C-alpha cells in the first residue's frame, strides 16, 4: 500500500538524518573538547543540524538516481582469444521494495541492455519483500538481454523474503538461477 511505502520512506529519511546528526554531534563534541572553545558551542549546534540535513538531502537525491555503470577490466593471463573482450554486467543490491519500484528496475534493465553484454550476473539482494508483493515490480528483469544469458544468485534479502519462491519467480522471468552450482558458457 502507498501509505506503507511513504512511512518507510519517512522512517528511512528520519533514521538517516538522526544517524548523521549523531556522528556530527560526536565529532563536534570532540572538537569542542580538544579546542576548549566555548564561543563555538551554540553556533556549532546550528552547523551540525544544517550539515545533517544537507547530508540527508544529498543521500535522498542519490538514492533516486539510476545505478551507475562502473567499468572494470580484469586482466587474465593466457586468456583464449575467443574470450578477449568478453563482457559481464553485474547487478547487485537493487533492493526492490517499499522505496525501489518497477520503474527503477526498468531503468536499470535499459541501461544494462544498452551495454550489449555477453552475460549478466545478478548477485543477490534483489528484493526486500515476498514474491506476491513484488512480482510486478521485478517483472522488468525478464527483459534483460545478454548473448549467453542472465544469471542470478540469492543474497540474504531473498532468504528473508522467501528464497525458494524468488528462485522460482526468477526462473519464470527467464533468468538462469544458480544455487551452489556453476555453469560452463560455450
Cite the ranges covered by each PLM segment:
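Non-catalytic terminal accessory segments
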Residues: 1-65
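Short, functionally important structural connectors and interaction interfaces within domains
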Residues: 2, 59-61, 66, 75, ...
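Short amphipathic alpha-helical coupling elements at transmembrane boundaries
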Residues: 5-12, 36, 74, 89, ...
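Arginine residue identity/basic-tract feature
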Residues: 6, 17, 28, 40-41, ...
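Long, contiguous hydrophobic alpha-helical segments, chiefly transmembrane helices and signal peptides
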Residues: 10-25, 67-69, 94, 121, ...
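Sparse, context-dependent recognition of short Cys/His-centered cofactor- or disulfide-binding micro-motifs
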Residues: 42, 46, 52-59, 73, ...
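Hydrophobic alpha-helical transmembrane segments in integral membrane proteins
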Residues: 45-46, 54-79, 98-103
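Soluble catalytic domains of enzymes that build or remodel membrane lipids, polysaccharides, and related
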Residues: 78-186
Amino acid at each position: 500500500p502507498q501509505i506503507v511505502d511513504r512511512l518507510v520512506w519517512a522512517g528511512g529519511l528520519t533514521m538517516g538524518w538522526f544517524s548523521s546528526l549523531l556522528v556530527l554531534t560526536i565529532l563536534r563534541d570532540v572538537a569542542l573538547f580538544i579546542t576548549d572553545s566555548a564561543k563555538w558551542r551554540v553556533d556549532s549546534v546550528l552547523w551540525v543540524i544544517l550539515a545533517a540535513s544537507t547530508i540527508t538531502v544529498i543521500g535522498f537525491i542519490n538514492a533516486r538516481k539510476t545505478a551507475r555503470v562502473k567499468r572494470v577490466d580484469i586482466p587474465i593471463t593466457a586468456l583464449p582469444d575467443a574470450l578477449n573482450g568478453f563482457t559481464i554486467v553485474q547487478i547487485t543490491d537493487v533492493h526492490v521494495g517499499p522505496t525501489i519500484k518497477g520503474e527503477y528496475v526498468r531503468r536499470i534493465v535499459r541501461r544494462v541492455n544498452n551495454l550489449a553484454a555477453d552475460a549478466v550476473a545478478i548477485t543477490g539482494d534483489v528484493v526486500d519483500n515476498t514474491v506476491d508483493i513484488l512480482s510486478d515490480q521485478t517483472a522488468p528483469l525478464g527483459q534483460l538481454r545478454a548473448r549467453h544469458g542472465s544469471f542470478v544468485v540469492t543474497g540474504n534479502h531473498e532468504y528473508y523474503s522467501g528464497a525458494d519462491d524468488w528462485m522460482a519467480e526468477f526462473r519464470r522471468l527467464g533468468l538462469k538461477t544458480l544455487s551452489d552450482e556453476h555453469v560452463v558458457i560455450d
